[in-house]
Structures are given as C-alpha cells and as structure tokens.
Regions:
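Periplasm/extracytoplasmic soluble domains of Gram-negative envelope assemblies
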Residues: 85-88, 96, 128
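Acidic, low-complexity mobile loops and tails
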Residues: 20-79, 116-151
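Residue-level recognition of beta-strand microenvironments
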Residues: 40-42, 86, 103
Length: 151
C-alpha cells in the first residue's frame, strides 16, 4: 500500500483573520509589523506595541522584560527596552514614534505571559506622534513572507 505524506497541520491556514506562518507562528490581520518583529495594534491615536509570536518562539522561554516608563518618548527605530529569555536577550525597537501612556505591568512578575499569548500581552501603549509612520511597516501578508525568508 502506497503511503501519502500528510501535510503539516495548519501550514498556511487562514481562519478568522489569523494565519499561521511556515514556522507555525501566529500572524494577525489588521496589525502592523516591523522587521525587528514588533507589532503595532492601532486604536485611534494610540497603539499597543509588543513582540510577535515569531519573536517569542525564536527567543524561547522569556524570563524578563525591561519596559519603558510612562511618559517616556521614543522616535521610530529607538530602543525602548529588552526581552530576555533562557536562550538570548533582544532589544525592543519602537516601530513608531510616540509617548508611552501605559505599560503592561503584569509582565513585571510574569514575563512568560508573552510566550503564552504574544499578541494578548503587549509591552507598551503609546500616544502616536506620526501615524504616517505606519505606512513603512508591513501588513500581515508581507510579514508572513518576511518570516518565511528569515526561516
């Protein structure tokens, strides 16, 4: 009897605005993505910024998140903190310019929440200084293609 190979589960699948990259990392439609693997979720003139599922998978078990302070101001491409895992440390690069209006304090005691749900556990919320900067970021499809080239 000839065996037919089974494709990997969910490879390239799309459901309810969520797609899965070849690395099995989740990518969400409607968000903006940077080449340094941060995402931006915009709500009016404010935005949530965190690391992508691809980033948390690459880092492994996250043990510490160095977050900015409320009222800190960042330009796009400025470092705003760092994420440390058992495998590596990675600088966080702000994909947008703005003023920090909130940080996710839960990550101080439970940095591993990012491993459980990277998109649900943002790092900082900013008041955007220049929404036109979003045009230089990737949409979900472009980010998937970017991750596929990196992998």
């Amino acid at each position: 009897m000839k065996r037919i190979p089974t494709p990997p589960p969910l490879a390239g699948a799309r459901a309810a605005g969520v797609s899965i990259t070849k690395t099995m990392a989740k990518v969400i439609e409607g968000l903006y993505y940077s080449e340094s693997h941060e995402y931006v979720k915009v709500e009016g003139d404010e935005a949530y910024v965190g690391i992508t599922d691809y980033a948390q998978e690459s880092l492994g078990n996250i043990v510490y998140v160095d977050m900015p302070e409320v009222d800190d101001e960042f330009a796009a491409e400025d470092d705003f903190g760092a994420v440390e895992s058992v495998k590596a440390a990675s600088d966080l690069v702000s994909p947008v310019s703005g003023t920090v209006i909130e940080v996710n304090e839960a990550l101080e005691d439970q940095p591993e929440l990012i491993n459980q749900d990277a998109f649900g556990n943002w790092i900082m919320k900013v008041k955007l200084s220049d929404k036109s900067e979003l045009d230089s970021l990737m949409d979900a499809k472009a980010y998937e293609e970017f991750c596929a080239k990196e992998h």
